[in-house]
Amino acid sequence: MATTASLFSLPPLRLGHRRLLPQTSGSDSRFQTLAAKKAAASTDAGPGGSGLLSVLDRKLTDEEEYRRARAQVQRKGVEAEGYGVEGISVGGHETCVTVPSLNVAFDIGRGPLFAVRQDNLFITHAHLDHIGGLPMYIATRGLYNLKPPTVFVPPCIKDDVEEMLQIHRRMSRIDLEVELVALDLGETYEIRNDLVARPFQTHHTVPSQGYVIYSVRRKLKKQYAHLKGSQIVKLKESGSEVTDTILYPEVAFTGDTTSDFILDPRNADALRAKVLITEATFLDDQVDVDHAREHGHMHLSEIMEHSQWFRNETIILTHFSNRYSLEDIRQAVNRLQPKLLSKIVALTEGFKSEYS
């Protein structure tokens, strides 16, 4: 996986775990040592040999599980259709997802450092685990002399967000420079000349909206396809528009939502974006679909139920409940139908392994 340049370097993740066997010297790993001891034990014909083999088998299995889980914990982001996606999304705790090549962040949770370099921030709704880090995000950009960010919010919360920032300005006696944009459903905002954003309707317990980021391409109008280059130049010089502007949905982000957004025909672009970043708060039968819907969230079973509507190349699942471990998430996702599973990536940063 390609790594994305970052303004900040994060400290290495320390994982605590029960040592299975004493550390060996030199280049031998604990895993190799266990394997060697198992091989040695297999030649032991004395009493109790089979018991020792059984213990070592269990330790080998534990070690393999630990190595897999550690690899999952250390993975800081994912690659999807040419886009590096970095983020953390733990249900009820914090959500912030960035796509650095597009210079965008979605939601700002606790204001993680990896989001600070993104100039454009899209807020889906006003719950603290999605917006709580906004003042710190703005302040940190100022601290590092980065230009004021552009922050997009649902129109119904703009005044409250501005009031919140004013309170922090008074308390902190700092400027908190920001361009705050109320972006409504049906509106389009140009991020740069080849990139635009549009919100779409989501369904949560408070007013909410998702966002689609589109690439902008221009194609010669059909009626001019037979003309030579010099003729097209003359038309352009005369003021004629010779191209059509076509928007291609690249990345969509839902934030918190029920599955109702899937069935809304106005959200077709979100369901055909190359990459859809959506939520799956609940994964198993400990919590049923009715409970998920009552709290404005999705159950993994609903993603399976509606899988025929997803035209995305990759679906990144986020916002799992903190009740789940890395192993719980992996096992639940692996139970999806093969065709759907081939599209799914689980964003598991922030989740613990049973072996850590």
Language model features with spans:
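Cap/insert and terminal regions of metallo-dependent hydrolase folds
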Residues: 2-45, 234-353
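Conserved beta-strand hairpin/beta-sheet module of binuclear metal-dependent hydrolase folds
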Residues: 26-120, 209-213, 219, 244-254, ...
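Active-site-proximal loop/helix segment associated with metal-binding centers of metalloenzymes
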Residues: 57-60, 90, 190-280, 284
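Active-site metal-binding motif and surrounding structural segment of the metallo-beta-lactamase
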Residues: 107-153
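Short, well-ordered alpha-helices that flank and scaffold nucleotide-derived cofactor binding pockets
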Residues: 136-139, 163, 305
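Active-site neighborhood of divalent metal-dependent phosphoester bond hydrolases
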Residues: 145-149, 157-184, 323
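Short internal beta-strands
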Residues: 148-157, 277, 317
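General small-molecule cofactor/ligand-binding pocket signal
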Residues: 177-184, 198-200, 345-347
